[in-house]
Amino acid sequence: EPFRPFAWPIQYIQTVGYPIVGLGVIDTTLVVLTQGRPYFIQGSHPSSSIMVEADINQACLSKRSIVSMGNAVFYASPDGLVGLSPGGSAVVTESLFDKFTWQDTGPADLLGCMYENKYVGFYNVSSGIGGFIYDMKAKTWNFHTVYATGGYNDLKNDALYIIQSNELSKWDSGTALSYIWKSKKFTFPEPKSFACYRVQAEGYPVTTKIYRDGVSIVSLSVTDDSLRRLPAGLGTDWEFQLE
């Protein structure tokens, strides 16, 4: 009841089957993340609330990884980043990389934040510090080199504040960082040759690299969107990188 202790009277107590790690919220639904399966508690009043076990076998590894983002709650599981909602749940990173690559980000100590409908993660592992950004709408994943020990999403000012070396910083407000994008490997059934390429960007210069059968055939700082010729030759595997 409003303004009453959450578990009083005793009839209001809900019991889950695993130790609780943390909580999330979706509208009027409370999301309970545990060391086993997650649960939904739905209802407008404690006396009429209903608890439902989620349809996904993914434990929550880190309380600090839990982020409530509109119609879903995201958290770190052993297999990847999970998006959880009453309408359906899934490991959203499953198609991006495998379980072992995910483990390299240290999900047990992952810090999660929200910014512009994106999940921003920060990690500190033996191989180094850094983080990643998962865009829910575009279904894309990008790594970054920024590390933070804490974060706060200020809805009033539409800003994300992070803690770096005991100092407060505003996300996406400082000097622009370099960005590297590399395509997947395009494999053709027969060797192919391409005549030219064009790089269209919001700003220049853009360092462009093109690989044919694993060998770099172009490495050039492009300053405009002019057509440029490719070196002659056939290749089965093609990759493209922009920086």
Regions found by a protein language model. Name each.
Residues F3-F6, I10, S47, V206, ...:
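Generic low-complexity segments that are intrinsically disordered, proline-rich and/or Lys/Arg-biased
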